[in-house]
Each structure stands twice: as C-alpha cells, then as structure tokens.
Amino acid sequence: MAIITKVSAQKRQGRYNIFLDQEYAFSVSEKTLAEFVLLKGQELSPQKINEILDYEASAKASDLAARYLSYQPRTIKEVTDYLSQHEISRSAAKRAVNELTHLGYLDDAAYARLFVKNNLQVGKNGPGAVRRDLKKKGVDDDLIEAALADVTDEEWAGVGKRLVKSLLGQQGKIAKREVDRKMQTKLLSHGFSGSLAQAVTQDLVPEADEDQERAALVKQVLKAYKRFKRYEPGVREQKMRQYLYSHGFSGDEISAFLVGEIIPLEELEEY
C-alpha cells in the first residue's frame, strides 16, 4: 500500500500533484481530488491508484470534449477524433462521448438538422454535397436522410440561385446556352441533381433575349478576330468557328457572322 505524503496545488488552476511515499506519483483535477477525497496520509492500493487514474483520464477527456464543443456543435465522430488527436485512450474517449450524449451535448440527429438549416440559410451546397459532408462527419445515413426529408425543391432552388447568381453578369457577354451550361456545371459540382440544376437555370434565365444574344456574339466575334487575325483566311475562319462554338453559339449564328450578316467583315478592323 502506498501512502499519500503530499498534495500540492499546481500553478495551473484546478490541478493538483499527488506524492506517494515522498515521491511525485501523478496529477489530478479538482474533480478527481474531490471524488476520491485524496488527502495526506491516505493509503492507496495499486487497484485504487488504477481506478483514480482511469477516472482522471475520463475526466480529462470530458473536459477536453466540453471545451471543443463550446466553440460550435460537433458530431460524435468529430469529438472522438479530437480526443484521439490529444492522446486520450479509446476507452476514456468512449466514456466521455457517452456522458456528453446522455447529457444532450452530443446529438448527431440535431447536428444534421442544424447543418441542413444553416446551408439553406447561408450555404451554397445542394443535397448531394450536404449528404456527402455529413457522411464525412460520421453522421449515420438514416439521420442524414431524416434531416434532408423535409426540405422542398423550392428551398433547394433558393440555395442554387444564391450559388450561381454571379453568373448572371455574363449575360450579353457570352451566349445564353453557355451561361446555362456554366450554371448547370456549377450546380452539379455543388451537389444539385440534374433536374434541380435545370430548374434553377430556367428560372433565372427563362429564355434568350435577342438583343443580348447579338451583343454577346459581337463581343466574342471581336475577341476571336483579334486573337486569330494573323492567320491565313481559311485557318482563321476555322479557329474563329471553333472559338465561337466553344462559347455557346450555334452553327447558324457563327455562319451568319462569317458571311458578314452580323458585322461586315471589312469593318472588323475598325472595332
């Protein structure tokens, strides 16, 4: 049996050093000190020392986890990973997580609902990306689907419009179909389905404006001409056709330009 010969407070508030048989043995929190009533002269068996150290590890894990949660909500996996990074044993981490779950501080279902709500309010991700992000955070599939279930297509469309509204500034600069393509590509990359992406695009840019389309064609024609005018006529025409096609203009529109219907070809140098 070892005897506690000294209990001294550390400079760090709430921490205490325990000396057994005149030698430093371990340190504990105030919570552990009170739980085991650790006082000078107390005898401790090896089993009791292990019990104290085990309790202290759990208390440390709980304190670390609570501090981590104080900044923002977390998932069970995030807290478990955080404790592991701080060299908390698996058993102590599990006890801390169970305690915080029992107290209601850890709740993956509530976290998933809040995550979805925040995305609807200020985020720019579609359901696919939200689902993927929650899976990375360790949330169970059933909880993810439950959180997504009440979100309507109209609500997702609102998120999608927020994501791609900056592309509206390209109207009149590139062809409408190219604006549509860019919007849908961006929406798909952020987890929106094809049908949602199409609905958002159609709602934002319902139909082509003839004046805007003509202005966009003229703008790109001038860019293309300046870029390729050094080539021989045949090569220049081919390169300009490819350039304009890549910017969303139809074959008929491109042909109309190449025969001088949009801008007389002899006037291109004047622009």
From Swiss-Prot:
HAMAP family: RecX (MF_01114). Belongs to the RecX family. InterPro entries: RecX_HTH_1st, RecX_HTH_2nd, RecX_HTH_3rd, Regulatory_RecX, WH-like_DNA-bd_sf. This is Regulatory protein RecX. PANTHER family: REGULATORY PROTEIN RECX FAMILY PROTEIN. The gene is recX. Modulates RecA activity. The lineage of its organism: Bacteria, Bacillati, Bacillota, Bacilli, Lactobacillales. Pfam families: RecX_HTH1, RecX_HTH2, RecX_HTH3. It comes from the Bacteria. Transmembrane segments: none annotated. Keywords: Cytoplasm. It comes from Lactobacillus delbrueckii subsp. bulgaricus (strain ATCC 11842 / DSM 20081 / BCRC 10696 / JCM 1002 / NBRC 13953 / NCIMB 11778 / NCTC 12712 / WDCM 00102 / Lb 14). GO terms for cellular component: cytoplasm.
